[in-house]
């Protein structure tokens, strides 16, 4: 109240004095008599008071007095490794990148009727760089309001399609916002009792180096999901400058004990890593999350 409003009080002030304490007591109607107020005794409202009743009701609604981790989400029916047979078989004479391989993996998982609805693809703004625009048409970009405009590429097959039932979270140039969405989906097994499988793909240089503290917080929350560091390596996107040349995100990832990190070279390796991650996190309920770096250099991939 007026004892502090507009006052330039120094941070070295450790306690309130007599007059100030009385004004504070009167403002908040704390029933402490004048002869005791200067000693600032603790005050606890009676058990039948409106304040205590309110506090107990709110605490009960939140699940109790001590923090607990709810384990009520059922395990998901993860498909067999054979679902990725097109990738396990190699690329023949065709040259592809591991980024392209990942998009094929994601597409195959989205065709599986048992887990498709649990998958949450997340991109900040680089979906076209990763070749994911085909998903715009098949599953759509989530928008609570739907599509309110005609996109400039509306005449193309893979146009920018927003939908109230869309599945992709296209977050714009906001790695922190995109990672917040990933964390929400990655912890939904506990907070909502629903297993979600978030795949957040981004330029790897803009991951742990930019939102590493949020990744640590997600690890503390026992998040489960996949982080995909695209355009990884120091030879990628050199024309856009050093800010895209990541050669050290795995060092940052290694500081988080429950972050399982891989830097695969071939599509069959990536398929096995993703399948193993799905099994560990969504069948065995292990408290881990995966970080996988992806390249955009094209190579022939063996079986």
Where are these regions (language model features)?
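Conserved P-loop NTPase catalytic core
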Residues: 13-45
